[in-house]
Amino acid sequence: MKSVVFRDTENLEIIETKLRNLKDDELIIEVANCGVCGTDFHIFNGHSHAKKNTILGHEFAGTIIVKGIDCNGFEIGDNIAVDPNIYCGKCDYCKAGKIQFCENHKALGVTEDGGFAEYVIVPTSQAYLLPKEYSLSDAAFAEPLSCCIRGIDQAEIKHGDSVIIVGGGTIGLLMLQLAKLAGASKIIVIEPNEKKHKYALELGADYILSPDRINLLYEANKTTNGGADKVIECVGSPDAVTLSLQLIKRGGTIVIFGLAPEGKSIKLNLQEAFKKELTIKTSFLNPFTFGRAIDLLINRKVEVSSIPVTQLGFDSITEIFSTSYKSNTLKYQFTNKLKETL
């Protein structure tokens, strides 16, 4: 089968690979769609870790074509979305319910072969059944949505809170919808790319501000009456985190969601943080949230079909890693159904 294999930093190869032997509680999935995540770019650029010679891709959905003998509840032909994060259930963190810190954590598309391939082996524990009519392209958003749910949980948004979302890409648009569901009364999205502004407005943002505006802080403070109750940072850069610290009101909560390249840091004004009684949280992985993501998607409480997706086949998937990632495209998805895409 064709696969996109991570060899080393800035080195991806499209090669023929073979599936390993199937275990009794595993499924073989024909991949329909697999989202390209910012983490994939971090891995490619050497800013995040993955096991060498692993097939990348961790945001995927597809159809069961083979099942092991111990796969009750699943049938050949079923469509599924896949939670890539595999926890041991035995370490102290898992026993304490903090599975995101599992000492033996594995992830499809990072430490184990993932979805940038024609086929992938998936444990039944990671497979979530989908309605037959539900779009597999939309289902591939389940993994990033499940991570965003964790971020929203960390924010602890209360009814009537003002929320600023820093970054209007795919993650920001998912966070925007989750913030509305959580009861936020006023949501501001900060995004420099004007071509992305309309999507945030369509999905319910009350205001859009550009970080390049000279009076950004004045406008944000005026709109939120002195700062937001919650700020959710969805960029993964020191500048975005520093801006978040300036946008939060006294007693507010900041959630640092974006994954910054390894080694990046910020300067924190300790006295300002002290006087504001800030709560600063981070959000890691998707503990116990994947099922919630599936429910939100299939019940159309979170809308992803309006987020523009560029579909890429094997002939062009590696090109986006070797060219500039800064583009107007909100979401790339790999699909092995395409022969030519660019």
Which positions does each model-derived feature cover?
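Glycine-rich cofactor phosphate-binding loops and adjacent beta1-alpha1 units
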Residues: 155, 203-277, 340-342
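NAD(P)H dinucleotide-binding glycine-rich loop of Rossmann-like/cofactor-binding domains
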Residues: 88-166
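Short glycine-centered segments of the SAM/dcSAM-binding site in methyltransferase folds
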Residues: 79, 162, 252-253, 279
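Residues in the short beta-alpha loop(s) of Rossmann-like NAD(P)-binding domains
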Residues: 193, 260, 286
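Mid-domain Rossmann-like dinucleotide-binding core that forms the NAD(H)/NADP(H) cofactor-binding site
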Residues: 135-214, 218
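C-terminal hydrophobic helical "lid"/dimerization subdomain
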Residues: 3, 242-246, 287-342
